[in-house]
Curated annotation (Swiss-Prot):
One Gene Ontology biological process: mRNA catabolic process
NCBIfam families recorded: HDIG (TIGR00277), RNase_Y (TIGR03319)
Stated name of the protein: Ribonuclease Y
InterPro entries (UniProt xref): HD/PDEase_dom, HD_domain, HDIG_dom, KH_dom, KH_dom_type_1, KH_dom_type_1_sf, Ribonuclease_Y, RNase_Y_N
EC number, as in UniProt: 3.1.-.-
């Protein structure tokens, strides 16, 4: 038993020792393997790093070589440029030297020629002096006296030639200007077509039956008095069947009265309170219609940027007239004529059209200041920030201020064309006859005038002068003086042509 135990203990001890030895041997082997692997990996890393460093070195070397090559190339190019420049400078230097040599040769040649010329000049002066002495001896005049006589004769000849030349130029300019002006005016008129509108100072309001007249008059005339007080229009109710006459010089008031009457008659309620209500409503409608008319007019004409108050004034032109011609129609016609004429003359047609539309705005305000309508219109345009050339065209279209823009004469001419065309305006017969008589009497006031005739509705004045009192040259100045006096002292539409006629008659009798 004990032996068995001892054997077991010995076996255990031997087994433990063997196990320990085997364990130590295994650890050493594994350590050796790890060391070998580490050494191998270190060798690989070392080789990789060496390769990487070598690659970087080679790349850096290649980059440096490229940079050096590029710099060498630039240096070579710079050297080539310097060589070329040096070559060019050498060539230029040679050229300068050559030209300097040529210049010196030319200078020497010129100096030699100057010496020759000076000698010849001295000889010529001597010859001239000898010839002058001979001429003075032959003519009996000194050189200064002969020179003065020659200059005087040349002056007279030059004056005669200049006068003839000026007359030719003036005749040609008059002929050309006349033809061109006629062409432009005719073309402008042909390209503008407008209606003829004749306004009256009365409006006839038609009613269905005469029974309505009594309702309009009201008890003891209270309705008609209320209507007249509200509108400012005289209402004439007479025996004219189915008609009531509205009389007022202000077309806006007449239009308000007409529309108010139409609404009252249609509604059937006619009494003072209702009349005031309807008139106030209609007045507002008419004001809106005025603004709408102004806007529509500017849109039709292609005019933009006008002040709202100017648009209102343009709309109000619809209810104004001048010598029976509707003012808005006249303004539109003048605007279109201005645009056409400005285009023909190479000016801005839009600005000309704007000036033509606004030229009569001074006739619109209800108050009547002391200023003429052209100057008042100019002040209104300036107030609402219109450009200076537009304002000048408005103010100068009746020569009441100096024309400082090219638009002014265009507006003046187109205004005259629009107002002077047949059927455009209507004048009172007495005023028409008086104007003709005034024209004839004005011309008769000049000495030497024997007869005068106003023809073509006062657009031409023929003046007969005595041949023994006025010569041909004086006829031209007389026509100019008469034209200026008519322009300064008279008011007339369009233009007046003055023709002075001088006739010489020789009468003999054979017996």
């Amino acid at each position: 038993m004990i032996t068995t135990v001892i054997i077991a203990i010995v076996c255990f001890a031997v087994g433990g020792g063997l196990s320990y030895m085997l364990f130590r041997y295994g650890l050493k082997s594994k350590y050796d393997i790890i060391i070998k692997e580490a050494q191998t990996e270190a060798e690989v890393i070392k080789k990789n790093k060496l390769l990487e460093v070598k690659e970087k070195f080679l790349n850096k070397k290649a980059d440096l070589e490229k940079e050096v090559a590029l710099r060498n190339q630039k240096i070579q190019q710079a050297e080539n440029k310097l060589k070329q420049r040096e070559l060019m400078l050498n060539q230029k230097q040679e050229e300068v030297q050559r030209k300097r040599t040529e210049a010196e040769a030319i200078k020497e040649n010129l100096e030699a020629q100057i010496v020759i010329i000076d000698k010849k000049k001295d000889e010529l002066d001597k010859l001239q002096m000898q010839e002058r002495e001979k001429l003075e001896a032959l003519s009996g005049l000194s050189a200064e006296e002969a020179k003065e006589r020659l200059i005087e004769s040349l002056k007279e000849e030059a004056k005669t030639q200049a006068a003839s030349y000026i007359n030719d130029i003036m005749d040609d300019a008059k002929l050309t200007a006349n033809k061109e002006a006629k062409r432009i005016v005719i073309q402008s008129i042909q390209r503008v077509a407008t209606e003829t509108a004749i306004e009256n100072s009365v409006t006839v309001f038609h009613i269905e039956s005469d029974e309505i007249k009594g309702r309009i008059i009201g008890r003891e005339g209270r309705n008609i008095r209320a209507l007249e007080a509200a509108t400012g229009v005289e209402i004439v109710v007479d025996d004219t069947p189915e008609a009531i006459v509205l009389s007022a010089f202000d077309p806006v008031r007449r239009e308000i009265a007409r529309l108010a009457l139409h609404q009252l008659v249609t509604d059937g309620r006619i009494h003072p309170a209702r009349i005031e209500e309807v008139v106030a409503k209609v007045r507002k409608q008419v004001e809106e219609e005025i603004i709408e008319t102004g806007k529509r007019t500017t849109i039709d004409l292609g005019i933009h940027g006008l002040h709202p108050e100017l648009i209102r004034i343009i709309g109000k032109m619809k209810y104004r007239s001048s010598y029976g011609q509707n003012l808005l129609q006249h303004a539109r016609e003048t605007a279109n004529l201005c645009a056409v004429m400005a285009s023909e003359l190479g000016l801005n047609p839009k600005k000309a059209k704007r000036a033509g539309l606004l030229h009569d705005i001074g006739k619109v305000p209800d108050e009547e200041p002391e200023l003429p309508h052209a100057l008042l219109g100019m002040k209104i345009a300036e107030k609402y920030k219109e450009k200076p050339d537009i304002c000048n065209a408005i103010g100068a279209h009746h020569d009441e201020t100096e024309m400082t823009s090219l638009l002014a004469p265009i507006v003046q001419v187109c205004d005259a064309i629009s107002g002077a065309r047949p059927g455009a305006r209507r004048e009172i017969v007495e005023a028409y006859i008086k104007r003709l008589n005034d024209l004839e009497q004005l011309a008769m006031s000049y000495p030497g005038v024997t007869k005068t005739y106003a023809i073509q509705a006062g657009r031409e004045l023929r003046v007969i002068v005595g041949a023994d009192k006025i010569d041909d040259k004086q006829t031209e100045s007389l026509s100019g003086e008469i034209a200026k006096k008519i322009q300064d002292e008279m008011t007339y539409p369009g233009q007046v042509k003055i023709t002075v006629i001088r006739e010489t008659r020789a009468v003999s009798f054979a017996k």
